[in-house]
């Protein structure tokens, strides 16, 4: 019997309509299954609940329809990728079988067989050209759409977590919860990037498409297994091993092989979750120590503290390396096992199918398609094994972000002084009690009222609770109770710390803080800077520098008074806000404050007797919770 004519493995004239139907059906089934699985993960797994708590508002918020539509489009891209891979396997089958038929025709002298093989070869090349264009187009669109989704999600989540961190002053009150968190800044910057990329423990890369993400990578793997199983099932024959016949041997071989390899991989890779989490935590702690040294460079230089700082940095760096060594050893074992498994299986389909090819039961193209299907099923079933370390790193990012969300919620839930707006622009403290973290009373219940234009100086020995009282009134200190009535409009009440906050940006931004720089004319800024003895800075308003390092502590405190004049509050609390100034300049600034804002209520914390004369009333904290409130003995100075 002579060689047979070439016959295409599928009817290519029906490939397009059949593919459209297949893609539509596969997308619908996949969407339903993915949604069901995500719901189950949400309710049945701890990390699913954590994931949902972090980003729930993005998927059920006002723009959620657009989010789900984008996910649907990305899922469509995944389904198209699988369908193209299936068609490529048939195209490869036709190409190799056509070559085989052409060679058989040449060898047998049968021109008809030869011509059928040649026509089949060029037909397969034409099919390949069309599919290659579709494949490249899909990949480019896939990367673009994936990046759009990731970027939009990251923008939203960064804003969401930043606002959550700022809301209710959680950024400060987090310090007082039982289990404090480390480096919230890194969690918002780095872990959000890892979280939204969804590719494992690495930040987003511009080349990432759906196949790079854990979710869509898993979906593509499952669809590929189902799609190529049908092909492999039809191409598999019976294998005899020690007299035992195994039908559909190729299919069962790949299932058993991958199952055993995956179980062993999970055993080897299990510690990677904790090692990845510790790697992030320890590196963040070391980075924070370096940042602190940079910010305190002048103080360290005065102390000649280089040796101590070096020792402290080394102490923090040593556990980074110790943990990383364990991480590397475990990763080498994990990756070594996966590589061995992947390399061992490469020749297996050829070895198993070779006897059937030599017996003429199948064509060469069938063997090639068998190897392609076998490889796709193996790679797809191995997805979870190969990406176990990526899942571990992604899980670590979820833990860290959930820790931030949880800490913010606990920080906001801590008790605080109840603040109410006053009807007459007065400041009134009702039953304000301040305690230490251990529960000891720091200030007994306190009642004070100041009307418009009134002033109060708070004095007492160090540790008596002066600054803590101001923190309590600012709703920062959680170990306090009582009610504070104060002017309640935006920026109608200001609190100034001893070392003013200097934000990043231009000098204009620094001086106008917390107001918008665009809302204040240059002439007003220059006039205000001149009044607080900072006239030399008037020509530097648009310079962008690290002003916290450029300005001296005294200049920073004068900037704080400039902010008061620009904001025009109705009440201001100052915590030793002139401690870096000489007595004369201190007096001048208080006189300026009273002349510019005569109706403003001024409450100051001070250690200087001279400052007491600039106020009408004095609250002296005596220690042990006791206090004394009385008019200032000397008549208040003209301020």
Curated annotation (Swiss-Prot):
Q: Which top EC class is given?
A: translocase
| Residues where ATP binds | 462-468, 498
A Pfam match is ABC_tran
Where is the protein found, in the record's own terms? Cell membrane
Known EC number: 7.6.2.-
* Keywords linked to the UniProt accession: ATP-binding, Cell membrane, Membrane, Nucleotide-binding, Translocase, Transmembrane, Transmembrane helix, Transport
Q: Give the disulfide map.
A: none
| Any one GO MF annotation of this record | ATP hydrolysis activity
Q: Where does the record place the ABC transmembrane type-1 domain?
A: 67-393
Source taxon at top rank = Bacteria
Reported regulation of activity: The presence of cobalamin does not affect the ATPase activity.
List the CDD domains.
Answer: ABCD_peroxisomal_ALDP (cd03223)
InterPro entries referenced in this protein's UniProt entry, alphabetically: AAA+_ATPase, ABC1_TM_dom, ABC1_TM_sf, ABC_transporter-like_ATP-bd, ABC_transporter-like_CS, ABC_transporter_sub-D, P-loop_NTPase
Oligomer status and interactors = Homodimer.
Q: What is known of its domains?
A: Contains a large occluded hydrophilic cavity that spans the entire thickness of the membrane and extends into the intracellular part of the protein. It consists of two connected chambers. The larger chamber is located in the transmembrane domain, and the smaller chamber is formed by the part of the protein that connects the NBDs and transmembrane domains.
Q: What is this protein called?
A: Hydrophilic compounds import ATP-binding/permease protein BacA
């Amino acid at each position: 019997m002579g060689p047979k004519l070439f016959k295409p493995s599928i009817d290519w004239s029906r490939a397009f309509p059949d593919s459209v139907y297949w893609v539509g059906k596969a997308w619908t089934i996949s969407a339903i299954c993915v949604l069901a699985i995500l719901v189950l993960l949400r309710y049945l797994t701890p990390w699913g609940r954590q994931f949902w708590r972090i980003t729930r508002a993005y998927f059920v918020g006002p723009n959620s329809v657009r989010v789900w539509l984008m996910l649907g489009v990305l899922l469509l891209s995944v389904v198209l990728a699988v369908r193209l891979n299936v068609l490529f396997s048939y195209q490869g089958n036709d190409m190799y079988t056509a070559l085989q038929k052409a060679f058989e025709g040449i060898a047998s002298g049968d021109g008809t067989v030869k011509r059928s093989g040649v026509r089949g070869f060029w037909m397969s090349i034409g099919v390949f050209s069309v599919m290659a264009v579709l494949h490249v187009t899909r990949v480019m669109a896939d990367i673009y759409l994936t990046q759009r989704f990731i970027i939009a999600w990251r923008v939203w989540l960064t804003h969401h977590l930043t606002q959550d961190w700022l809301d209710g002053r959680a950024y400060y009150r987090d310090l007082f919860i039982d289990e404090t968190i480390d480096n919230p800044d890194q969690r918002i910057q780095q872990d959000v990037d890892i979280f939204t990329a969804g590719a494992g423990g690495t930040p987003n890369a511009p080349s990432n498409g759906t196949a790079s993400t854990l979710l869509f990578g898993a979906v593509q793997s499952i669809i590929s297994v189902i799609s190529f199983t049908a092909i492999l099932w039809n191409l598999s024959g019976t294998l005899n091993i020690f007299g035992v016949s195994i039908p559909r041997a190729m299919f069962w071989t790949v299932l058993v092989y991958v199952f055993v390899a995956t179980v062993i991989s999970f055993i080897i890779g299990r510690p990677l979750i904790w090692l990845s989490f510790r790697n992030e935590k320890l590196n963040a702690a070391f980075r924070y120590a370096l940042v602190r040294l940079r910010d305190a460079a002048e103080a360290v230089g005065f102390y000649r503290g280089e040796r101590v700082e070096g020792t402290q940095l080394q102490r923090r760096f040593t556990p980074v390396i110790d943990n990383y060594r364990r991480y590397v050893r475990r990763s080498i074992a994990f990756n070594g096992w996966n590589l061995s498994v992947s390399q061992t299986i490469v020749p297996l389909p050829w070895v198993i199918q070779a006897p059937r090819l030599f017996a003429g039961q199948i064509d060469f193209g069938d063997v090639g398609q068998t190897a392609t299907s076998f490889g796709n099923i193996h790679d797809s079933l191995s997805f979870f094994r190969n990406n176990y370390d990526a899942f571990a790193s992604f899980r670590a990012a979820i833990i860290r972000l959930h820790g931030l969300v949880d800490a913010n919620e606990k920080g906001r839930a801590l008790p605080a002084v109840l603040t109410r707006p006053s009807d007459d622009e007065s400041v009134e403290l009702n039953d304000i009690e301040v305690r230490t973290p251990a529960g000891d009373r720091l200030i007994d219940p306190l009642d004070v009222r100041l009307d418009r234009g009134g002033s109060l100086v708070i004095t007492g020995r160090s540790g008596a609770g002066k600054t803590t009282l101001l923190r309590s009134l600012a709703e920062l200190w959680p170990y306090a109770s009582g009610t504070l009535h104060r002017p309640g409009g935006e920026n109608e009440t200001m609190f100034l710390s001893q070392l003013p906050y200097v934000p990043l940006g231009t000098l204009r931004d620094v001086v106008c803080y917390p107001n918008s720089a665009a809302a204040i004319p240059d002439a007003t800024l220059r006039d205000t800077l001149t009044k607080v003895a900072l006239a030399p800075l008037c020509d530097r308003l648009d310079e962008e520098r690290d002003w916290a390092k450029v300005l001296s502590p005294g200049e920073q405190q004068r900037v704080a008074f400039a902010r008061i004049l620009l904001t025009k509050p109705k009440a201001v609390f100052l915590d030793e806000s002139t401690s870096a100034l000489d007595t004369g300049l201190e007096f001048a600034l208080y006189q300026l404050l009273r002349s510019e804002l005569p109706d403003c209520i001024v409450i100051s914390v001070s250690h200087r007797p001279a400052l007491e004369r600039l106020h009408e009333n004095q609250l002296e904290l005596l220690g042990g919770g006791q206090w004394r409130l009385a008019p200032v003995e000397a008549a208040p100075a003209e301020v």
